[in-house]
């Protein structure tokens, strides 16, 4: 399977799955395509997912968004910056393979619709995204 990631809109809710005694999946809205085989995500320092990927770096990131994006990216994750912003770590996923879930029988027209209801959280999210974008170029 090819490992080239398509583009997806800013704010797309992705689902990060990590290993452990049982699978663990969480929504992640701060996910940035940083190249054809690289994704950057931001995780709060206290997240169980962060502890899990430190113990076992194998992860899967499901992405569903407008533009008919329906895929799961499989790879290894590592923390590349512990304090991206206060209490948030930057995680790099080196994608080894991409499973495309698209079919001729349907089209993904939109991802999850969501918005911040707290202005402080919204401002922090913008700060996190800007910091991820600064890490994106290699």
Residue ranges of model-derived segments:
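Binding-site signature for planar aromatic cofactors or substrates
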Residues: 1-138
């Amino acid at each position: 399977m090819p490992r080239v990631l398509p583009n997806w809109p800013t704010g797309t809710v992705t689902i990060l799955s990590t290993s452990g005694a049982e699978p663990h999946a969480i929504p992640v809205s701060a996910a940035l395509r940083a190249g054809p085989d690289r994704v950057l995500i931001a995780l709060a320092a206290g997240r169980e997912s962060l502890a899990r990927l430190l113990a076992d770096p194998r992860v899967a990131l499901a992405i569903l968004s407008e533009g008919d994006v329906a895929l799961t990216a499989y790879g290894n994750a590592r923390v590349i910056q512990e304090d991206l912003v206060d209490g948030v770590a930057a995680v790099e996923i080196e994608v080894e393979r991409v499973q495309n879930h698209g079919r001729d029988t349907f089209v993904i027209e939109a991802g999850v619709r969501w918005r911040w209801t707290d202005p402080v959280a919204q401002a922090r999210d913008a700060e996190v995204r800007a910091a991820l974008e600064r890490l994106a170029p290699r």
